[in-house]
Design a protein with these regions (language model features):
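Radical SAM enzyme [4Fe-4S]-AdoMet core and its adjacent flexible, acidic
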Residues: 1-49, 53, 221-334, 343-344, ...
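Flexible mid-to-C-terminal extensions adjoining Fe-S/redox cofactors in radical SAM and related proteins
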Residues: 2-24, 28-31, 39-43, 352-448
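Conserved alpha-helical substructure of the radical SAM core
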Residues: 32-196
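Short, charged low-complexity linear segments at domain edges
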Residues: 88-109, 319, 325, 359-375
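Short cysteine clusters
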Residues: 120, 124-127, 331, 345, ...
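A short, flexible beta-alpha/helix-coil linker loop
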Residues: 130-134, 216-219, 284-287
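Radical SAM/AdoMet-radical enzyme domain recognition
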Residues: 140-160, 166-280
Length: 448
């Protein structure tokens, strides 16, 4: 505890450099971060080297991104996000998680995804969340308890999914206020972001929205309904004016790959004030899913190249949940780095894999992590030595079939339960077709 307090004091001292003269003192800040992080396996040495390399190249796009954060985001918000994300969730939280992973011999996540509600004011084509219905909610006290339990395990990063989380925006802001040492990110369709909510975000300083965007107006409104794109632009304008950080969430499909990976799209994001873009591969989850929306192998290869191109050239941080598996050792679900708790309290291994043998209303968070299904993940990860084939459903469907059968996990889709066989059968052909591309890309990136 004493060591943690010293680190917090060190960060506070370091951040004063940024407040006084941010552009000139970034290197001093990183020197402080190096001292606080120390040495050893939990010191984020590789990540710190990357940041130093960015600071050594002020002409680079990533340096420009750092400047955007400093210039475009409220200084107190930057300070809070820096402290809660980099200090609490990473430098302090990670070593505690590693210790507990060894102590309990199970996965301890870095982040928890929560569905405050299954309610949503839109009905998007192919959306898996619609399978839950619209009447389920985790109470404020249940959400609060999950966060309290998470913090005991060293977890300070919480991500809201849904449904539309902002249906519960008053509770979400209250949780931000109560857990001021945590960082909260929320996926949202942006239709409920108004000036009052933006002011609340500015007040609590630890809430970051990730707005769902499908591409240009035609692509977006085609999946989310006429007028949705206009509401997204209105929300982005408001957030930028309030100097609040935000990003986008992009589900890439066979229909929109070109639209959401073009230079025009990336430049539009930067112009609107977007700081990060989180890409997700369309998953055929649910009985009403549309398998035809799954990208072809050539489209997925194109997304692999385009997201990396964006990271090399644009002042925007792009992440691909599926194609960046090579950077995180494959599948991160099952509590290895994150888990998902739906609005019914069911603890799923992944936001895309709706099977569970535990409910947070009946077990503690740690007990859920030690359940048969989560231990099956723990014992079988990685599911493929090629981390461009990370998922036990999409690229290795036999793995999910086996784990669900062995643990007798049940479908958590409330309205229309889907068997693991039905789900995985939609992925068999895809997995077979993707394998040659994955092997080619993996071999090219591991030539040495």
């Amino acid at each position: 505890m004493f060591g943690q307090e010293l680190k917090k004091m060190g960060i506070a001292t370091a951040y004063r450099y940024i407040e006084k003269n941010p552009k000139d003192n970034l290197r001093k800040l990183m020197t402080w971060v190096d001292r606080i992080a120390g040495e050893g396996p939990d010191s984020f040495e590789e990540q710190r080297k990357v940041i130093w390399d960015i600071l050594d190249h002020p002409e680079s796009n990533m340096y420009q991104l750092i400047m955007r954060v400093i210039e475009e985001v409220d200084p107190e918000v930057v300070k809070t996000v820096f402290s809660n994300f980099f200090l609490n969730a990473a430098i302090l939280g990670w070593p505690k998680q590693e210790k507990l992973r060894a102590e309990y011999n199970c996965n301890i996540p870095w982040a928890i995804l929560l569905d405050p509600t299954s309610a949503c004011n839109l009905h998007c084509t192919g959306c898996w969340a619609a399978e839950y219905g619209n009447k389920l909610n985790l109470t404020f006290d249940e959400l609060d308890s999950i966060i309290e339990q998470g913090k005991e395990l060293g977890i300070y990063f919480y991500i809201y999914t849904g449904g539309e989380p902002l249906v519960r925006k008053n509770d979400l802001i209250a949780l931000c206020k109560k857990h001021s040492d945590c960082i909260f990110l929320s996926f949202t369709n942006a239709t409920l972001i108004d000036e009052a909510f933006a002011d609340d975000m500015l007040r609590v300083k630890n809430f970051v929205p990730a707005i769902s965007v499908e591409g240009d107006m035609a692509a977006h409104d085609g999946r989310r309904g006429k007028g949705s794109y206009e509401k997204v632009e209105k929300a982005m304008k408001l957030l930028k004016e309030k100097k609040l950080p935000f990003g986008v969430s992009c589900c890439y499909t066979s229909a929109n790959c070109d639209s959401i990976s073009s230079d025009e799209f990336y430049d539009w994001l930067v112009d609107k004030g977007v700081l990060f873009a989180w890409y997700f591969h369309y998953m055929p989850v649910g009985n009403d899913a549309v398998p035809q929306l799954m990208p072809t192998p050539s489209q997925r290869e194109m997304m692999y190249d385009r997201v990396r191109y964006c990271r090399r050239t644009k002042p925007l941080f792009a992440i691909d949940f599926q194609n960046d598996g090579e950077y995180v050792g494959g599948c991160v679900a099952g509590g290895r780095r994150y888990l998902h708790i739906n609005a019914n309290g069911d603890v799923d291994p992944c936001v895309f894999i709706h099977y569970s043998d535990s409910n947070i209303r009946e077990k503690t968070l740690l007990e859920c992590l030690q359940s048969p299904l989560f231990m099956a993940y723990h014992e079988n990860q990685p599911f493929n030595e090629n981390h461009l084939r990370p998922c036990p459903m999409l690229e290795n469907p036999q793995k999910l079939r086996e784990m669900v059968a062995k643990t007798q996990a049940k479908s958590t889709d409330m309205q229309s339960p889907e068997s693991a066989e039905h789900l995985c059968s939609k992925c068999d052909e895809y997995a077979k077709n993707w394998t040659p591309s994955a092997e080619k890309l993996w071999n090219e990136s591991h030539k040495e």
